[in-house]
Amino acid sequence: IDADYSQIELRVLAHMSQDEAMCKAFKEDLDIHTITAAQVNGIPPEMVTPQMRSSAKAVNFGIVYGISDFGLARDLGIPVYEAKKYIASYFKQYPGIEAFIKELVSKAKEKGYAETLLGRRRYLPELTSPKYMIRQFGERVAMNMPIQGTAADIIKIAMIRTFEALEKGGYKSKLILQVHDELLIDALKTEQQDVVEILTECMQNAFELAVPLKVDVHSADSW
């Protein structure tokens, strides 16, 4: 039985930034990439093409990693000026995210470290390096670590709760693997339904965010 979080880093970003538009999309269970493409291109969601959605997806996840206009241009195979316009349009639609990212970098420079919602820290001496490229790297880490690190903290909580629930229930099914935002249980077929419910509940309720944590669960004979 395999369960993975749906867009957990973007959900963490929505929660931490409190951006109204992104929070609204997740609360209404909308496809965030389609919604982003529609808003950035100024069209209704039903008019979004697969290419538009793919570009929006690259920006959504790229923002989490502090992507530059040069990086986005490379990833999408478009001119740098187009990538720059796309990012500017993105931040216009999600102003809370732009302000939040700037705040993350500012706080990291002030404190010397970035931290997750649960208080896990990464110290960033790179931010005071005399070398520009190293300082830029430090800024990207300052943007990304609180988001990706919080997502990592959440799945660790889910792992502990799932393990404890299986032990407490006396199940023979075992939690055997974690891969990024995904948990895998080697389950007896006679316990399948119970295990699906336990895994879903433990993952969805691992941490309370301003938007729902969504989990996709699949069962198969092999991984």
Which residues are covered by each model-predicted region?
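Conserved catalytic core of nucleotide polymerization and phosphodiester-bond processing enzymes
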Residues: I1-W223
